[in-house]
Structures are given as C-alpha cells and as structure tokens.
Regions:
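Active-site-proximal cap/lid insertion segments
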Residues: 1-104, 116-124, 175, 179-182, ...
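C-terminal cap/loop subdomain of S1 sulfatases and analogous C-terminal strand-loop tails that border
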Residues: 61-67, 102, 107-110, 115-191, ...
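A general structural motif at alpha-helix termini
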Residues: 134, 202-205
C-alpha cells in the first residue's frame, strides 16, 4: 500500500516539511506587512492626515494549507481561496468597529475612491461604490458575486482547472468548464450549514431548484463581465 512504501513516505515527509517551512515564511511575510502598515499610519499621524485619509486594507486571495487536500495553493473557488480580508479606515464616514456582511469584490475599490474624491464613476468602470452601504438608509445591493479562473495553457499542472463560480450569502456553485459532461463534476455547497464545504450537494434532489437557479444566475454574471 502507498503509506507503507518507504519512498512514498519519504516523498510525503518532504512535502510536509516544505509546507511547514512555507507556513513559517508566510507568517514572517505577514509580520513584515503589519510593520509596514504601522509605519504608514505613524507617518500619517505625525503629519496630521491620519483621520483625513481613507485607508483600504485587503488581500488579493486566500491560501490553502491542507484544506480540501490542497496546499500550498490559492487558485480554487473554495472559501480559503476567494474570501479575503477587506478593511476600511475612514473616521469621517465609518465608525470604528462597524461590520458589514454585504458581498464585495475588488472592482468596488475604484468607483469608491472616485466617489470619495468627488467624481462620478464612468459606465466603463466595473464594480460599485461601497459608500451607499455606509449610510443608514436601505440599499439595494448585489445578491451574488462571480469568481472564475482560466487555466488553459497557463501551467501544465493546471490544465483543465478552468472554472466559473457563483457565491451568494448562503450558497456556492462551482462549475468546472472542461471537466465531466453536463456539469456532473460541479460542486454545490450550503455555506450556512457547511462552512468548510465538505458536503457536495450537486446531486441532491431537494437542492435541485437552488442548483438550477444558481446556474442561471451564473450565466447572467458571466454575460455581465464584459470581455471575461
């Protein structure tokens, strides 16, 4: 058996050791980022501009270290890959400790900053300004976001990994573009009951209406993503 093979154990041990070292390196990197952010805040405070500056802190993606049997990796549509920190400090508009559960995407940053600067985002700008979310008035906001990865001819080990996914406040559907037939390898998760995405509901009959709606909504999001 595989786990009894000395060569297999040697290979697995080397992968584990490499992963542990990468975790340590990433921890050091984050500590360095934290120090850098602190230095920026110190300079702004000394110049008297700290509370007059909108500071947005976010990550471009998450990372896997064993979740879903992956790691180190970041390209998949599971929560560890697509859900990342998004923090804003701007005392003029945002009270400290405010938390929002609305679905944001990185494309929302540009129109937000344009509006903060007194401008009006043009029709070619993707994303939406998040400033309306900071008001106390009810706001009609997006109900789902699109996540996708195009892997063909990128790296040999990633061929066939192209996917398009839709995430709502509760569900996620991952459609593997070049795997299986008629979406038989697609994945559907109830993030409320299964936050770690361990139970694929794609073939669950009770969830068939949800699956079909998500498929339709995914097509609409892809169509709206001009050029993608």
């Amino acid at each position: 058996m595989l786990f009894r093979s000395p060569k297999s154990r040697e290979l697995l041990d080397s992968i584990h050791a490499g992963t542990q070292e990468e975790i340590r390196l990433r921890a050091r990197m984050m500590a360095s980022v934290d120090e850098g952010v602190g230095m920026i805040l110190d300079v702004l405070e000394k110049k008297g501009e700290l509370d007059n500056t909108c500071i947005i802190f976010l990550g471009d993606n998450g990372y896997f270290f064993g979740e879903h049997g992956l790691g180190p990796e970041r390209r998949f549509a599971y929560e560890e890959g697509i859900r990342s920190p998004f923090l804003v400090r701007y005392p003029k508009l945002i009270k400290a400790g405010t938390r929002k559960k609305d679905l944001l995407i990185c494309q929302d940053i540009a129109p937000t900053l344009i509006q903060l600067a007194g401008g009006k985002p043009g029709p070619q700008i993707q994303g939406r300004s998040i400033l309306p979310l900071l008001s106390k008035k009810p706001v009609k906001w997006r109900k789902a976001v699109l996540a996708e990865y195009w892997a063909e001819q990128a790296y040999p080990w990633l061929i066939g990994m192209t996917y398009k996914a839709i995430r709502t406040d509760r569900y996620k559907l991952i459609h593997w573009v070049n795997r299986g037939r008629d979406g038989e390898l697609d994945e559907l998760y109830d993030l409320e009951k299964d936050p770690f995405e361990l139970k694929n509901l794609i073939r669950s009959k009770p969830h068939a209406p949800i699956r079909e709606k998500l498929h339709r909504d995914l097509k609409l999001l892809v169509a709206e993503a001009v050029g993608l």
